[in-house]
Curated annotation (Swiss-Prot):
EC numbers: 7.2.2.8
Gene name linked to the record: copB
Role: Involved in copper export. Can also export silver.
Region called 3 X 12 AA approximate repeats, residue ranges: 60-97
Family that this chain belongs to: Belongs to the cation transport ATPase (P-type) (TC 3.A.3) family. Type IB subfamily.
Ranges annotated as spanning the membrane: 109-128, 140-160, 171-191, 201-217, 360-379, 389-409, 704-721, 724-744
Regions of this protein lying in the Extracellular compartment: 129-139, 192-200, 380-388, 722-723
Induction: By copper and silver.
Amino acid composition bias (Basic and acidic residues), ranges on this chain: 36-76
PANTHER family per the UniProt record, alphabetical: ATP7, ISOFORM B, CATION-TRANSPORTING P-TYPE ATPASE-RELATED
GO molecular function list: ATP binding; ATP hydrolysis activity; copper ion binding; P-type divalent copper transporter activity; P-type monovalent copper transporter activity
Entry binding sites for Mg(2+): D638, D642
Comment on pH dependence: Optimum pH is 6.
Protein name as catalogued: Copper-exporting P-type ATPase B
């Protein structure tokens, strides 16, 4: 495939680009390529700005987006309790979608049932000072234990049924086997003692009651932790108000439910109110707090024509907006859908934990049976049953099964709240072993917006303010990025341009008009030379070397000023590059700008490898070359013109997406334009991996130690675990994993 890059034959190519200590790359730059630059074609650009590399500084076009519904998110979707959504196959039997309030109620009612059972029955035949007996107390224990087994054991019995139905027996099956063996044997002992009062067959009612109560408590705590793991997303779902103020056609207000709002409706949002939907400001100006939805900590200034995001908080101004995205297709819904999909995917570590958890059931089953047979010969039937039940209860595939999904739920939620959106969850795992970060210059390292970088007055009869008034008169009605940059500069300087009359385009070279009764032109270098105007080539070269686009102001056929416009480097870019280097990741800059402009930016930022004059296909080829060298590459770009290279890289990251987060080619989407968010993603990926490894070690290590102990391997030295203690340890193992996930920040 010809990508326009030929590292073998540089001498026959035009526009040698880049600076690479190891090797150089060249690009075939035809006339067509010179018209297709880093940010695509600019259809309506006035012709006087076609000089030099002007097309290379194109304005990014982040289209508009629509997004999603947060008003109808129920508990199971948000909390991650349904493990099938978390890619947790082994826990499929556990009905985590049960409302936590119902589970809490089941625990408390089971505890009430368990208290008299504990008071009226001995533990393993041992009597305690608090034990109470009376005629018929054994019947009370039987009835209460039966109710407790059916009611309190229901989640575990139902879970086991589902696991077996799916041919994936795991923790719920083990627990169900344990409590069923304890209950059935206890009923047998009750009948045997009833038939022959002179013999005493020990029951397990005490153990059964404590087992069920402790496991219900453990799973309630765990469910709460799982819910908290996605707490950030739960808060996102609660950001939208229930009612809004809608403007009627006659201008009066009406209060309506958010569900009644449609695209095109006009709403009024007062100071301090939450933005009910995505929209565009029609009237007013304000400062909006978007921290809860995009992670942008600073207030964002908004005025007429700007977009607002549903769920953000209006600041000190009252505004009127036109709805562009309702709860069903707004930004928040799109974020939630993206996060749900990411949480549903599986990483390599999760596949590993699922396999181990699946085999753990069979290990526990075999060890439990072996323990039963061994203790039947070494002791008696009650002791043998106790060992087997304890093994079944203490084995916890759940801890292993939850090890990864809980961390994933937490990390994806944290990422989403901070404007780091994962479209491919494996990107989080791959981000820990990166070798190279490739950065598209415009929009990533620079602001992506033109501004006036220099004005050189060539005629002492004119002052800078007057020069700007002339330029503003010509550019006031133009709509290309350079004109926008000039007019924004005038606005910042609070300069009102002159009025232009008889304005006309000079085909391919610039603009001309009558301003203040003088003939005024703004033209490019080609036209200036044609008119015989004297231009200092060294001065022009200096401007261009800094990545500037240069135009010339001519008043009454006399060259009076040179104006340079450039894309300003972001203040935080230099610190970002230094931080990347400290992580032993090589920064590489890619740009459609000319090599001299690329060199100026790269040298200022401390980037040793850079390539200029590139088209999208060229960038993809460069990414592929690094991949062919065995490097793991993250490509950061705008997600639109960089789509091929984003898709080709190990990780594709779109930066500065704003609300337009539906970027198919990216694995990660950053809503803000701050390159430091890339560092935040890398740090979160590192911490996420650390938590995953910790949880895997805990889940595996716990079972390696706990199962032999439950089988009675240390009985010779007097260390024997009862089923109740086994239940406590099993519950604690899942709680530890859950709480460890919650410490991820």
């Amino acid at each position: 495939m010809n990508n326009g890059i030929d590292p073998e034959n540089e001498t026959n190519k035009k526009g040698a680009i880049g600076k690479n200590p190891e090797e150089k790359i060249t690009v075939e730059q035809t006339n067509t390529k010179n018209n297709l630059q880093e940010h695509g074609k600019m259809e309506n650009m006035d012709q006087h700005h076609t000089h030099g590399h002007m097309e290379r500084h194109q304005q990014m076009d982040h289209g508009h987006m629509s997004g999603m519904d947060h008003s109808h998110m129920d508990h199971e979707d948000m909390s991650g309790m349904n493990h099938s959504h978390m890619g947790h196959e082994n826990m499929s039997g556990m009905d985590h979608s049960m409302h936590m309030g119902n589970f809490k109620q089941k625990f408390w009612l089971s505890l009430i049932l368990a208290i008299p059972i504990i008071l009226f029955s001995p533990m393993m035949g041992m009597s305690f000072p608090f034990q109470v007996t009376f005629p018929g107390s054994n019947w009370v224990v039987l009835v209460l234990a039966t109710i407790l087994f059916i009611y309190g054991g229901q989640p575990f019995l139902s879970g086991a049924k589902m696991e077996l139905k799916q041919k994936s027996p795991a923790m719920m099956t083990l627990i169900a086997m344990g409590i069923t063996v304890a209950y059935v044997y206890s009923v047998y002992s009750f009948i045997a003692n009833l038939i022959n009062p002179h013999t005493h067959v020990m029951d397990f009612f005490w153990e059964l009651a404590t087992l069920i109560v402790i496991m219900l408590l453990g799973h309630w705590i765990e469910m709460n932790a799982v819910s908290n793991a996605s707490d950030a997303l739960q808060k996102l779902a609660e950001l939208l108000p229930e009612s809004v103020k809608r403007l009627k056609k006659d201008g009066t207000e009406e209060t309506v439910s958010l569900k009644e709002v449609h695209e095109g409706d006009r709403l009024i949002v007062r100071a301090g109110d939450k933005m009910p939907t995505d929209g565009t400001i029609d009237k007013g100006h304000t400062i909006v707090d978007e921290s809860a939805v995009t992670g942008e900590s600073k207030g964002v200034k908004k005025q007429v024509g700007d977009s607002v995001i549903g769920g953000s908080i209006n600041g000190d101004g009252t505004i009127e907006i036109t709805v562009t995205g309702t709860g069903e297709n707004g930004y928040l819904a799109k974020v939630m859908e993206m996060v749900r999909k990411a949480q549903g995917e599986k990483s390599k570590l999760e596949f590993l934990s699922d396999k181990v958890a699946k085999w753990l059931f069979y290990v526990a089953l075999v060890v439990g049976i072996i323990a039963f047979i061994a203790w039947l010969f070494l002791a008696n039937l009650p002791d043998a049953l106790e060992r087997m039940v304890t093994v079944f209860i203490i084995a916890c595939p759940h801890a292993l099964g939850l090890a990864i999904p809980l961390v994933v739920a937490r990390s994806t939620s944290i990422a989403a709240k901070n404007g780091l959106l994962l479209k491919n969850r494996n990107a989080m795992e791959q981000a820990n072993d990166l070798d190279v970060i490739m950065l598209d210059k415009t929009g990533t390292l620079t602001q992506g917006k033109f501004t006036v970088t220099g004005i050189e007055i060539l005629d002492e009869a004119y002052q800078e303010e007057e020069i700007l008034k002339y330029i503003g008169a010509l550019e006031a009605h133009a709509n290309h990025p350079l004109a926008i940059g000039i007019m924004n500069y005038l606005k910042e300087k609070k300069i009102t341009p002159y009025q232009a009359q008889e304005q006309k385009n000079l085909a391919g070279v610039g603009l001309e008009a009558t301003v203040e009764d003088k003939d005024v032109k703004i033209i490019n270098e080609k036209e200036a030379k044609r008119l015989g105007l004297k231009i200092d080539p060294e001065r022009l070269k200096n401007y261009e070397a800094q990545g500037n686009t240069v135009s010339f102001l001519v008043v009454s056929d006399k060259l009076v000023a040179v104006i340079a416009l450039g894309d300003v480097i972001k203040p935080e870019a230099k610190e970002f590059i230094q931080a990347i280097k400290e992580k032993n990741i090589i920064p590489v800059m890619l740009t459609g700008d000319n090599p001299k402009a690329a060199q100026a930016v790269a040298e200022y930022l401390g980037i040793n490898e850079y390539y200029g004059g590139l088209l999208p296909d060229d960038k993809e080829a460069i990414v592929q070359r690094y991949l062919d060298q065995g490097k793991k590459v993250i490509m950061v770009g705008d997600g639109i013109n960089d789509a091929p290279s984003l898709a080709r890289a190990t990780i594709g990251m779109a930066i500065g997406a704003g609300t337009d987060i539906a970027i198919d080619s990216a694995d990660v989407v950053l809503t803000n334009s701050d390159p430091k968010d890339i560092l935040h993603f890398l740090e979160l990926a590192k911490e996420t991996r650390r938590k995953m490894i910790q949880n895997l070690w805990w889940g595996a290590g716990y079972n390696i130690i706990a199962i032999p102990l439950a089988a009675g391997i240390l009985a010779p030295i007097g260390l024997i675990l009862s089923p109740a203690v086994g239940a406590v340890l099993m519950s604690l193992s899942t709680v530890v994993v859950a709480l460890n996930a919650l410490t991820l920040k």
